[in-house]
Amino acid sequence: MLRTIVVFAPIIAALAWVIFNIQKPAREQFNRDFLGKD
């Protein structure tokens, strides 16, 4: 169990960092396109 946490924690952290960095500009673009039409 502890070994699984040690193995997966950096992977999950890296995935979360990548997803966060992808979503931040995508969300700004989404707000500009979708909310801007109203």
From Swiss-Prot:
Subunit and interaction comment: PSII is composed of 1 copy each of membrane proteins PsbA, PsbB, PsbC, PsbD, PsbE, PsbF, PsbH, PsbI, PsbJ, PsbK, PsbL, PsbM, PsbT, PsbX, PsbY, Psb30/Ycf12, peripheral proteins PsbO, CyanoQ (PsbQ), PsbU, PsbV and a large number of cofactors. It forms dimeric complexes.
Gene: psbY
Function of the protein: Loosely associated component of the core of photosystem II (PSII), it is not always seen in crystals. PSII is a light-driven water plastoquinone oxidoreductase, using light energy to abstract electrons from H(2)O, generating a proton gradient subsequently used for ATP formation.
GO cellular component: photosystem II; plasma membrane-derived thylakoid membrane
Keyword Transmembrane: yes
Protein's membrane topology: Single-pass membrane protein
The organism's taxonomic lineage, starting at the top: Bacteria, Bacillati, Cyanobacteriota, Cyanophyceae, Synechococcales
Localisation per UniProt entry: Cellular thylakoid membrane
Key word Repressor present: no
Family: Belongs to the PsbY family.
Matching InterPro entries: PSII_PsbY (IPR009388)
Taxonomic superkingdom: Bacteria
Organism per entry: Prochlorococcus marinus (strain AS9601)
A GO molecular function held by the record: manganese ion binding
Pfam families hit by this protein: PsbY
Entry's Gene Ontology BP terms: photosynthesis
Name of the protein: Photosystem II reaction center protein Y
UniProtKB keywords: Membrane, Photosynthesis, Photosystem II, Thylakoid, Transmembrane, Transmembrane helix
Family annotation (HAMAP family): PSII_PsbY (MF_00717)
